Amino acid sequence: MSHNMKGQKIRLAKAHKQNTRVPVWVIVKTNRKVVSHPRRRHWRRRSLDVK
């Protein structure tokens, strides 16, 4: 495995971690004003710009 692939794997892992829903405690704390995650990504609809 080259160094390039390792960097790409790290970036993919970061994108995977970022792609989570809003925590329940945030929804409760904000009294449902914050429900959706504006940067949420679906694997089929939006592609990643990973280099």
From Swiss-Prot:
InterPro entries: Ribosomal_eL39, Ribosomal_eL39_CS, Ribosomal_eL39_dom_sf. One of its GO terms (cellular component) is ribosome. GO terms for biological process: translation. Signal peptide: none annotated. Keywords: Ribonucleoprotein, Ribosomal protein. It comes from the Archaea. GO terms for molecular function: structural constituent of ribosome. Belongs to the eukaryotic ribosomal protein eL39 family. NCBIfam families: PRK01242.1. This is Large ribosomal subunit protein eL39. It comes from Methanosarcina barkeri (strain Fusaro / DSM 804).
